[in-house]
Amino acid sequence: MPAGLSYSLTGNPNFNTDIGGFFCGSYNTRGSGSAPKNPQFQELYVRWMQYGLFCPVFRSHGADAPREIWQFGQKGEPVYDAIEKQIRLRYRLLPYLYSTAWQVTSNNDSYMRPLFSDFAGDQRVWDMTDEFMFGRSILACPIVDPQYTEEKIIRTNAMTGWDRKELTIDNGQLTINWTDAKTAVKYLPKGAKWYDFWTNQQYNGGQDVTLTTSFDRVPMFVRAGSILPLGPEMQYVGEKTWDNLELRLYPGADGQFTLYEDEGDNYNYEQGQYATITFKWNDRSRQLTIGQRNGSYKGMLQKRQFTLVMPDGQTKQVDYDGSETSVKF
């Protein structure tokens, strides 16, 4: 994480890692390529996938062992399901990520943001390296310590040393209950209110919160005032159109978000073939304004719907034809 944040600070925004580590031979404890069956590697891989969820490029790659999801088990089993959950969420976040990519290329923004970039007045975050902003709305708080297997991580000044302990296996078998609930303490930066992405519970900033965590969920929060677009579940990019995006609204502050769209598979945007829609939330009036669509490109949706979702469960459907419209809650 410190490496990714440092790269962003140097003007290199498209950082990524080999999820699971390029070399994993020391986890092949039962023969060549057996790492995906090793509980230590399974936990490491799932947690690394959860970190990769918030990297500009989400990529599994490496040597010593295969990394396909089915190498870790089958659907219905905890490790497989945890990996699948991260992949599905990444696809749902594509409208947010693609729009952030436009801000990166057009406005010199960044995907991974050290917390002091947005909360410079909060001294607690000045040297924090295990939490960061993913875009302007999402506070990423990956789990960086093993919770289910014995593995000791030693940190010194954000540099990681590694001291792997062998697991004690009775009668040659190791049983781990991946469904056990654990806890993690995360810090919420001062100067904003925050919503737990999974539960919608609201918190004030400037405090540590103790979370009940699970193997398949990465701790993540959304800043009050955010407008978070989520797309449909997909098997691959372009499988489904964005004709009914879910817009999650997080009251507690004014906010805005610009949705960026283009053809998605060429460089025609460099010739101005793209469209943007700006959403603005007025917290005092509890009103969302969906602005007039600007620009166009081949294959652009002329009419669409947006499903607006509030943390308390309120939902409204909006038909949109490119003209400005407003919705009150």
Residue ranges and their predicted role:
Residues F215-E324, F329:
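Accessory, solvent-exposed terminal regions and/or long lumenal/extracellular loops of proteins
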